[in-house]
From Swiss-Prot:
Pfam families in alphabetical order: UPF0180
Top-level taxon of the source organism: Bacteria
Protein name stated in the entry: UPF0180 protein BCAH187_A1552
Similarity annotation: Belongs to the UPF0180 family.
InterPro entries per record: UPF0180 (IPR005370)
Length: 79
Protein backbone atom coordinates (compact mmCIF):
# COMPACT_ATOMS: atom_id res chain seq x y z
CA UNK A 1 0.00 0.00 0.00
CA UNK A 2 0.93 3.65 -0.15
CA UNK A 3 3.09 5.68 2.20
CA UNK A 4 0.91 8.54 3.47
CA UNK A 5 2.15 11.51 5.47
CA UNK A 6 -0.44 12.91 7.90
CA UNK A 7 -0.07 16.01 10.05
CA UNK A 8 0.20 15.02 13.72
CA UNK A 9 -3.09 16.61 14.83
CA UNK A 10 -5.13 14.41 12.46
CA UNK A 11 -5.06 11.24 14.55
CA UNK A 12 -8.46 10.02 13.35
CA UNK A 13 -7.25 10.21 9.75
CA UNK A 14 -4.01 8.42 10.67
CA UNK A 15 -5.97 5.57 12.25
CA UNK A 16 -8.43 5.27 9.36
CA UNK A 17 -5.64 5.11 6.77
CA UNK A 18 -3.75 2.52 8.82
CA UNK A 19 -6.90 0.39 8.97
CA UNK A 20 -7.01 0.55 5.17
CA UNK A 21 -3.50 -0.90 5.12
CA UNK A 22 -1.48 2.21 4.31
CA UNK A 23 1.88 3.03 5.86
CA UNK A 24 1.22 6.25 7.78
CA UNK A 25 4.00 8.70 8.68
CA UNK A 26 3.39 11.56 11.12
CA UNK A 27 4.40 14.89 9.57
CA UNK A 28 6.06 17.31 11.97
CA UNK A 29 8.23 19.15 9.45
CA UNK A 30 8.80 19.55 5.73
CA UNK A 31 11.48 16.85 5.85
CA UNK A 32 8.96 14.24 7.07
CA UNK A 33 6.89 14.64 3.88
CA UNK A 34 9.69 13.51 1.58
CA UNK A 35 9.18 10.05 0.17
CA UNK A 36 5.43 10.05 0.79
CA UNK A 37 3.00 9.14 -1.97
CA UNK A 38 0.49 11.62 -0.56
CA UNK A 39 0.30 14.07 2.37
CA UNK A 40 -2.69 15.22 4.42
CA UNK A 41 -2.43 18.58 6.19
CA UNK A 42 -4.90 20.51 8.36
CA UNK A 43 -4.91 23.60 6.20
CA UNK A 44 -5.06 25.84 9.28
CA UNK A 45 -1.87 27.48 8.10
CA UNK A 46 -1.80 26.34 4.51
CA UNK A 47 1.95 26.39 4.10
CA UNK A 48 3.24 26.52 7.67
CA UNK A 49 5.63 23.63 7.12
CA UNK A 50 6.45 24.42 3.50
CA UNK A 51 4.82 21.19 2.36
CA UNK A 52 3.04 22.88 -0.54
CA UNK A 53 6.44 23.86 -1.92
CA UNK A 54 8.24 20.56 -1.39
CA UNK A 55 8.96 18.22 -4.21
CA UNK A 56 7.12 15.19 -2.89
CA UNK A 57 6.07 12.80 -5.61
CA UNK A 58 2.41 12.81 -4.60
CA UNK A 59 -0.48 15.10 -3.79
CA UNK A 60 -0.99 17.35 -0.80
CA UNK A 61 -4.56 17.11 0.53
CA UNK A 62 -5.98 19.97 2.59
CA UNK A 63 -8.19 18.36 5.26
CA UNK A 64 -9.91 21.61 6.24
CA UNK A 65 -13.69 21.13 6.19
CA UNK A 66 -13.52 17.45 5.21
CA UNK A 67 -14.66 14.42 7.19
CA UNK A 68 -12.31 11.51 7.83
CA UNK A 69 -14.16 9.45 5.21
CA UNK A 70 -13.88 12.24 2.63
CA UNK A 71 -10.14 12.54 3.28
CA UNK A 72 -9.67 8.78 2.89
CA UNK A 73 -11.60 8.87 -0.40
CA UNK A 74 -9.36 11.68 -1.67
CA UNK A 75 -6.26 9.74 -0.67
CA UNK A 76 -7.52 6.65 -2.54
CA UNK A 77 -8.27 8.69 -5.66
CA UNK A 78 -4.81 10.30 -5.72
CA UNK A 79 -2.50 7.35 -5.13
Amino acid sequence: MAKIGVENSLTDVQQALQQQGHEVITINSEHDAQGCDCCVVTGQDSNMMGIADTSIKGSVINAHGLTTDEICQQVESRI
